[in-house]
C-alpha cells in the first residue's frame, strides 16, 4: 500500500541557519512515488521499540543536551504541542551546533574510553576502503568519470582509504557533510590528498562520477507508525514538563506493505531516504552519469515489515552501548533506523536509475578480493577485517545496493550472492 500523505514536508527546525535550511531543502526536496515494480539491471544491533524514558541521564555534556531539549520544547510549543518523530529526530541529530552530528562531541572510535559512541567499518579495518576501491575504480572506468562523491564522511577514514588506493584514477574527491566539526577532522585526515578534496554543504546541480555512502541512509529521519487495536497512528513527541513523551495521533499514513494480523505493531516509513535517492538520481542524470553504492544495515521490504518485527528498528548509540529510547540525552547519542532497501531501489528506479545489485556486505567485499587481501595481512589485521564479513557481525547485518544511470554493465561486487530478486 502506498503511504498516503507522503507529500507532507518535514520541517527540520526553526533555528536552522539559512545555509543549513537550503542544504536540507535541496537534500530532501522530492518525495518519490512508489508506483513502480522493481526491475533489476545487467555496526549496530537490531532495533527495538522506542520506550518512554526517565530522563535521568547525566553526563559532562549535559549542557548541550539541555539547550537542545529546550530548542525542541520550543518547536513543540510552536507546532501546537505535538511534532512528528521525524522532526524530533532531525533536530536531535542536525540542529545547528547542538544536534548529535553538528556538535563538537566525540562520535567515532573503537574504544568507549575515548568518549566515542560507535565504530564504523572504515575505522575497524583499512581493508574496507581498500577493497571498496576496486568497485569504485570499475565504476569510474565504466562511466568515464574521475570524481568520487561521499555523503557523510565521518572521520575521513574511508575517503583516505579510497584516495590511497585509487591514485590517479580520481581527479577530485567531493565530501558533502553538514558538520563543521567533522569537516575539520576530515581535513586533518586527508591532508596528504588536500589538492584533490573539496567540501560542499548543499547539493550541486550536477553530479558526475561515483557516489559512496557508508551508514548514511540509517541516519535520515523516519516517521513512526503505530497500529493499536487495528487503528494506525503516527507516533509523535510532546512536552511533559522538562521531559519528552510519546503521543500517537490517528493518521492516513500506512506502511508500504499490509501488515498481517491485528496485533499492535510499531514500524517506520522512510520518505526522507527515498527523497534523497530521487534527488541524487536527478543530479546523476543531469550530467554524464555515474553510479552510487550505499552500505548500511537494513532489509528488503518483506523482511522489514514482517508481522513478527513488531517493535520497529529505531535504536540509539552512546559510548558503544545501544538503547531504544531516543527521548533522553538528546544530542548526546546517535539515533538510527534500519534501511528499507526495497524502498531505496524503487525510489531509484522511479527516478530513472538502474539497480546494479543488492547483497550482503560479506559477499560484496569477498567479490572484490577481501579474502586475498586478508591472506597477505598480519594476524591482527586479519582478525579486524574478519569482523567486516563475519555472519554474526557486519557481514550479514550490513547490505550493499548499487545504482547507476546505465544498467548495461555488471558491477564486480555483485558477481556472487546477488539478492536483487528479494527486493
PLM-predicted stretches and their roles:
Residues 8, 30, 38:
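Cationic, low-complexity basic patches in intrinsically disordered or flexible, solvent-exposed regions
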Residues 18-21, 26, 30, 35, ...:
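Intrinsic, low-complexity polybasic segments
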Residues 43, 54-55:
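Intrinsic-disorder-associated, low-complexity terminal segments enriched in Asp/Asn/His/Tyr and depleted
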Residues 58-151, 155-205, 225, 363-366, ...:
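Rossmann-like AdoMet
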Residues 149-151, 176, 211-214, 295:
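Active-site flanking residues adjacent to catalytic metal/cofactor-binding acidic residues
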Residues 196-198, 209, 290:
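Short, conserved active-site loop motifs that form the nucleotide-linked donor/cofactor pocket
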Residues 212-258, 307-317:
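A mobile, often basic/glycine-rich helix-loop segment
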Residues 254-423:
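Long, Lys/Arg- and hydrophobic-enriched amphipathic alpha-helices
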Amino acid at each position: 500500500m502506498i503511504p498516503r500523505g507522503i507529500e507532507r514536508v518535514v520541517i527540520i527546525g526553526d533555528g536552522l541557519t539559512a545555509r543549513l535550511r537550503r542544504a536540507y531543502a535541496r537534500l530532501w526536496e522530492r518525495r518519490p512515488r512508489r508506483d513502480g515494480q522493481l526491475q533489476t539491471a545487467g555496526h549496530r544491533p537490531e532495533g527495538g521499540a522506542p520506550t518512554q524514558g526517565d530522563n535521568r541521564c547525566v553526563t559532562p555534556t549535559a549542557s548541550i543536551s539541555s539547550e537542545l531539549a529546550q530548542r525542541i520544547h520550543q518547536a513543540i510549543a510552536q507546532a501546537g504541542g505535538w511534532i512528528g518523530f521525524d522532526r524530533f529526530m532531525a533536530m536531535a541529530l542536525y540542529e545547528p551546533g547542538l544536534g548529535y552530528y553538528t556538535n563538537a562531541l566525540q562520535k567515532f572510535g573503537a574504544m568507549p574510553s575515548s568518549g566515542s559512541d560507535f565504530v564504523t567499518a572504515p575505522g575497524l579495518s583499512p581493508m574496507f576502503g581498500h577493497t571498496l576501491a576496486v568497485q569504485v575504480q570499475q565504476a569510474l572506468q565504466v562511466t568515464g568519470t574521475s570524481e568520487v562523491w561521499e555523503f557523510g564522511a565521518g572521520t575521513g577514514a574511508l575517503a583516505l582509504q579510497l584516495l590511497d588506493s585509487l591514485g590517479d584514477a580520481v581527479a577530485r574527491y567531493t565530501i558533502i557533510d553538514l558538520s563543521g566539526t567533522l569537516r575539520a577532522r576530515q581535513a586533518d585526515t586527508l591532508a596528504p590528498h588536500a589538492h584533490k578534496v573539496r567540501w560542499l554543504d548543499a547539493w550541486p546541480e550536477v553530479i558526475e562520477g561515483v557516489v559512496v555512502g557508508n551508514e548514511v541512509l540509517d541516519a535520515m529521519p523516519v516517521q513512526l507508525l503505530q497500529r493499536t487495536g487495528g487503528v494506525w497512528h503516527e507516533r509523535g513527541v510532546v512536552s511533559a514538563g522538562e521531559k519528552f513523551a510519546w503521543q500517537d495521533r490517528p493518521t492516513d499514513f500506512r506502511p508500504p506493505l499490509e501488515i498481517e494480523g491485528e496485533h499492535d505493531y510499531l514500524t517506520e516509513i522512510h520518505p526522507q531516504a527515498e527523497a534523497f535517492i530521487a534527488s541524487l538520481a536527478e543530479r546523476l542524470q543531469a550530467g554524464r552519469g555515474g553510479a552510487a553504492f550505499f552500505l548500511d544495515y537494513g532489509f528488503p521490504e518483506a523482511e522489514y515489515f514482517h508481522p513478527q518485527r513488531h517493535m520497529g528498528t529505531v535504536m540509539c548509540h552512546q559510548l558503544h552501548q545501544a538503547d531504544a529510547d531516543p527521548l533522553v540525552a538528546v544530542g548526546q547519542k546517535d539515533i538510527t533506523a534500519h534501511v528499507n532497501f526495497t524502498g531505496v531501489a524503487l525510489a531509484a528506479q522511479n527516478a530513472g536509475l538502474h539497480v546494479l545489485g543488492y547483497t550482503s556486505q560479506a559477499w560484496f567485499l569477498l567479490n572484490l578480493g577481501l579474502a586475498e587481501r586478508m591472506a597477505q595481512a598480519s594476524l591482527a589485521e586479519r582478525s579486524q577485517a574478519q569482523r567486516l564479513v563475519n555472519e554474526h557481525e557486519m557481514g550479514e547485518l550490513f547490505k550493499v545496493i548499487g545504482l547507476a544511470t546505465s544498467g548495461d554493465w555488471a558491477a564486480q561486487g555483485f558477481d556472487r550472492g546477488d539478492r536483487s530478486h528479494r527486493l
